[in-house]
Amino acid sequence: APSGGPLVQHALQALLDMVKAGKMTLEQLVQKSAHNTATLFQIEDRGYIREGYWADLVLVDLNKPYTVSKANILSKCGWSPFEGHTFSSTIEHTFVSGKLAFSNGQLIEKGAGERLLFNR
């Protein structure tokens, strides 16, 4: 059976919908999803936009709705509980370790990431 995390692809969009609904600020979203993760797991050189850190960035159009369909699911499992749901934002580009990994709905460079290093 194919594996894959069916929630991962749309996690940021789900959180951005919470921002739009006033449940948290954009700053809180960044704190909880990037900064706290890097700090909690003691991941070296990630989770912040700082000189010398890896550029893991997502560029989002906050005003462009995105509907999840079977055709645009990238997870290996091939399904999502969000299928048919329309999010208020669209992920335009994703950079992993400074390399363009996703652009305009398409994976660009498979395996663009670098091995994580931990301070523990």
Regions found by a protein language model. Name each.
Residues 1-64:
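His/Asp/Glu-enriched, well-ordered alpha-helical/loop segment
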Residues 54-117:
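C-terminal cap of metal-dependent C-N hydrolases
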Residues 120:
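A cross-kingdom feature strongest in bacterial/archaeal respiratory oxidoreductases
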